[in-house]
Amino acid sequence: PINPWAVAQQQFDLAAERLNLDPAMRRVLREPRRELTVHFPVKMDDGSVKVYTGYRVQHNLGRGPAKGGIRYHQDVSLDEVKALAMWMTWKCAVVGIPYGGGKGGVIVDPKKLSMKELEALSRRFFTEIEILVGPEKDIPPPDVNTNAQVMSWFMDTYSMHAGHTVPGVVTGKPISLGGSEGRNEATARGTLFCVREACAVLKKPVRGATVAVQGYGNAGAIAARLL
C-alpha cells in the first residue's frame, strides 16, 4: 500500500527543489510541528469498555491557528493524518487565508456505534486533544464520517471545561450554534470553481463535458450534482 506521508514528503522535496528553498527551512517544513497520539476508554451500551486510538497533528502554525478536519474511520493512521496536516498547510497558504495546517482522526468504524456511544467517543476524544485545540490555536472542522452533530459535541465539551460558551473552537457547527450557511456545500462548490478555472486554462468547454467523480460522500455527491 502507498504510504501517504511518504507521498507528501516526496511532493514537498520536489517543490522545495524547484523553489530552491533554504536548507534550514526545508528541514522545518518537512516535519510536523506537533504530533499527539491518545488512547482513551469509551463505555459501550452493553457495559463493556473499549479503548480507542486517536491523533491530532499540527504541521505548521506560521500563518495562524491550525485548520484541518477530524475523521472517524477504521483505516486512520498517524502517517495519513501527518500527510493530511501537511497538505492543509499548503492549501491554506495557496488560497491566502491566515491558518496553518492540522488534521485529526480516530481509528473507529462509526457505523458500528450507537448514537450514545458515538457521543461518548467524540466527547472523550476532544477532551484528550484539548491541550492542542482552541480558537487561537487549532480549529477543527468536520471530515470523513464526522458532521455538524459531532462538531456540536466537540464545542459543548470544550465550552464546559472552559466555563463559558466557545463557538469558535470548531467550524462546521449547526446553524443554530453559530454555524455558517452554505458550509455543507462548501467543499463541493470549491471543487466546482477549481474545475471551471482548470477548464478555462486548458481551453476546454465545461458544458457537455464528461466528469468522473471518485467518492460519493459530502464532497463527491454534492460536486456531482453541482457539476
Residue ranges and their predicted role:
Residues 2-39:
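Short, Gly/Pro- and small/polar-rich lid/capping loops
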Residues 11, 80, 190:
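Charged catalytic carboxylate motif
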Residues 38-110:
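Glycine-rich, N-terminal phosphate-binding loop and its surrounding beta-alpha-beta segment
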Residues 73, 92-207:
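Glycine/serine-rich phosphate-binding loop and adjoining beta1-alpha1 elements at the start
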Residues 211-213:
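Hydrophobic Val/Ile/Leu positions in short beta-strands of Rossmann-like dinucleotide-binding domains
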Residues 215-217:
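Glycine-rich Rossmann-fold phosphate-binding loop(s) that bind the pyrophosphate
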Residues 220-221:
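N-terminal Rossmann-fold NAD(P) dinucleotide-binding loop
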Residues 227:
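Aromatic pocket-lining residues of Rossmann-like dinucleotide-binding sites
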